[in-house]
């Protein structure tokens, strides 16, 4: 395959490259347009790379960019003869009658450059497949990363005129005004939480943090179930701590109001079997997709969610939990930097796929040393930039976790410590431990299946 590639001329368009350089000679202000799109390496011909680089150097110094100054700059760096001398520069300067089409020519040069990068990347991936002895997962992750770098170069966005943004913003406001209710995002199913957040917004990274055994996994799973069973949105769940079967057992308990211990032991009554059948039917019709790969890389999460969105649609991503995700390995000697890199990538995934990403997080033991055990931002374990990247940071706190004699048994506080586009505050829910289920406080005794002492 390498021989086949070596026999073929890589994608390039010399005329377009000359047109870009000629347009800059003709109208130096065209350099600004070109520099927003092209870097020297985008030019196929080496001489064009050096000429364009000289133009950029002059532009950065605030000096005029014309035939005389570019010739002088190349001569001063002993590159004039390498690029073809003054005669070739003159030919380029005379090659285009107008600079009006520079953006069109620059786009051609950029696209040819992307194709060459893609070919080089694919060739490297193929060679690594034959020669490297790394774990297959490492090769896949690295291959995906390099392909993504090529794709991201293509997808860089330009400035948007505020007039265009205002039109889109007005349309969105009008849609919000015309819709019923105050929920503008994806409803969690918890009334007071939805009232405070207006639902979880697309593009948002939501961090849910708590000490072990407080109920953060149950809380997140309840949200996932509510979304998947009560809306037409699909939910991707990445469980790095528990297997898929354990998660499904928990979801069956919550969906069917089945005692968790009875389900674990198989000690089910006839009524329980009926509830189980109902719960299985409800969950099987929901769009819940579970990946229980331990130690999954953030690049794998991105790739799998991309594929899922293309094939089945995607409305929400849930990750349990953030500190178990592997980063790229670039910051392997500094775990805090690696976790910061992961949180930035998760925010990037939320924006790219336009879905809320809920990432559970551990809290440090520092919270145990204070008299008031309610968590604070500084308690997020290996926090790094987590609190900066997150749009919402929610802490879970249960008084009976620390005080067994408290009157607030099975009441959990959802402390919204940060909300980028909304208020902060506290929402209280009831936790029905037997069912691994959270319910709105006003519903606490509504369901006959929920014991009064819950």
UniProtKB/Swiss-Prot annotation:
<comment type="similarity">
    <text>Belongs to the helicase family. DnaB subfamily.</text>
</comment>
<dbReference type="GO" id="GO:0003678">
    <property type="term" value="F:DNA helicase activity"/>
</dbReference>
<comment type="function">
    <text>The main replicative DNA helicase, it participates in initiation and elongation during chromosome replication. Travels ahead of the DNA replisome, separating dsDNA into templates for DNA synthesis. The monomer has helicase activity in the presence of DnaI which is further increased by DnaB; the purified oligomeric form (probably a DnaC hexamer) does not have helicase activity in vitro, nor does the DnaC(6):DnaI(6) complex. The direction was not determined but is probably 5'-3'. Helicase activity requires an rNTP and is inactive with dNTPs.</text>
</comment>
<dbReference type="GO" id="GO:0003677">
    <property type="term" value="F:DNA binding"/>
</dbReference>
<keyword id="KW-0347">Helicase</keyword>
<dbReference type="InterPro" id="IPR007694">
    <property type="entry name" value="DNA_helicase_DnaB-like_C"/>
</dbReference>
<dbReference type="InterPro" id="IPR036185">
    <property type="entry name" value="DNA_heli_DnaB-like_N_sf"/>
</dbReference>
<keyword id="KW-0238">DNA-binding</keyword>
<dbReference type="Pfam" id="PF00772">
    <property type="entry name" value="DnaB"/>
</dbReference>
<keyword id="KW-0235">DNA replication</keyword>
<keyword id="KW-0413">Isomerase</keyword>
<protein>
    <recommendedName>
        <fullName>Replicative DNA helicase DnaC</fullName>
        <ecNumber>5.6.2.3</ecNumber>
    </recommendedName>
</protein>
<dbReference type="InterPro" id="IPR003593">
    <property type="entry name" value="AAA+_ATPase"/>
</dbReference>
<keyword id="KW-0378">Hydrolase</keyword>
<dbReference type="GO" id="GO:0006260">
    <property type="term" value="P:DNA replication"/>
</dbReference>
<dbReference type="InterPro" id="IPR007693">
    <property type="entry name" value="DNA_helicase_DnaB-like_N"/>
</dbReference>
<keyword id="KW-0639">Primosome</keyword>
<feature type="binding site">
    <location>
        <begin position="210"/>
        <end position="217"/>
    </location>
    <ligand>
        <name>ATP</name>
    </ligand>
</feature>
<keyword id="KW-0547">Nucleotide-binding</keyword>
<dbReference type="InterPro" id="IPR016136">
    <property type="entry name" value="DNA_helicase_N/primase_C"/>
</dbReference>
<keyword id="KW-0963">Cytoplasm</keyword>
<comment type="function">
    <text>Deletion of a single T residue in the promoter region (a run of 8 Ts becomes 7 Ts) decreases the helicase levels by 50%, decreasing DNA replication inititation during fast growth in rich medium. Suppresses the synthetic lethality of a dnaA1-yabA deletion for growth on rich medium.</text>
</comment>
<dbReference type="GO" id="GO:0016887">
    <property type="term" value="F:ATP hydrolysis activity"/>
</dbReference>
<dbReference type="GO" id="GO:0009295">
    <property type="term" value="C:nucleoid"/>
</dbReference>
<dbReference type="Pfam" id="PF03796">
    <property type="entry name" value="DnaB_C"/>
</dbReference>
<comment type="subunit">
    <text>The DNA replisome assembles sequentially on oriC in this order; DnaA, DnaD, DnaB, DnaI-DnaC helicase. Monomer in the absence of ATP, in its presence forms a probable homohexamer which is not active as a helicase in vitro. Interacts separately and simultaneously with helicase loaders DnaB and DnaI. Interaction with DnaB does not require ATP. Interaction with DnaI requires ATP, probably forms a DnaC(6):DnaI(6) complex, which is not active as a helicase.</text>
</comment>
<dbReference type="GO" id="GO:1990077">
    <property type="term" value="C:primosome complex"/>
</dbReference>
<dbReference type="GO" id="GO:0006269">
    <property type="term" value="P:DNA replication, synthesis of primer"/>
</dbReference>
<feature type="domain" description="SF4 helicase">
    <location>
        <begin position="179"/>
        <end position="445"/>
    </location>
</feature>
<dbReference type="GO" id="GO:0005524">
    <property type="term" value="F:ATP binding"/>
</dbReference>
<dbReference type="GO" id="GO:0005829">
    <property type="term" value="C:cytosol"/>
</dbReference>
<keyword id="KW-0067">ATP-binding</keyword>
<dbReference type="InterPro" id="IPR027417">
    <property type="entry name" value="P-loop_NTPase"/>
</dbReference>
<dbReference type="InterPro" id="IPR007692">
    <property type="entry name" value="DNA_helicase_DnaB"/>
</dbReference>
